[in-house]
Amino acid sequence: RGRGPEAFWQSAVWLRTAFDDLRHEAHAVVAAGDIVVIHATMSGTHSGPFVTYDENARVKQAFAPTRRSFAVSHTHWYRMSGGLCIEHWANRDDLGMAEQLGWIPPTPAYLWRCRRARRAAQTAHRASSIN
């Protein structure tokens, strides 16, 4: 996790690596003072490994692609200053997404595919850290 525009961009790249047709459909936008709230639906297809990282930026886990689609509700809160976002919070339906994508309950075969995906992600992460 980082800060600033580059971190925002890297988050978008990270998500699109796992969900190549990722979409956000805004249903409501509310502004009050320095806060802007957006309620939306996020949807896409799980087409690549979804890799998560620990607090030390090491690969924590990887969900192997399922080729399944999902659509979940989420709300984003932004604190604005001088026309720029200075803080961001999000509430997402991660459980609903995991169920729709077949991550839970996992089958033994899917657990094996996730283990292989995690090893591949760790290898790629080590290689990118060397270069």
Describe each model-derived feature in a short phrase.
Residues 1-131:
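C-terminal and inter-domain tail/linker signature
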